[in-house]
């Protein structure tokens, strides 16, 4: 997910995206805790995507 793609989205769409990413992160953490996670790099990607979305939400709130 690129920051440019996210910048084009509205605040509502970003909030929806954030909820989806948080759910995905939760599922990945549960898989990791259970020893079933094969692709551990996905956790890092999702965490960074969450940070991107939160950063853009803060930027839009301040503007």
UniProtKB/Swiss-Prot annotation:
It holds the Pfam family Ribosomal_L29. GO terms for molecular function: structural constituent of ribosome. Keywords: Ribonucleoprotein, Ribosomal protein. One of its GO terms (biological process) is translation. InterPro entries: Ribosomal_protein_uL29, Ribosomal_uL29, Ribosomal_uL29_CS, Ribosomal_uL29_sf. GO terms for cellular component: cytosolic large ribosomal subunit. NCBIfam families: L29. Belongs to the universal ribosomal protein uL29 family. This is Large ribosomal subunit protein uL29.
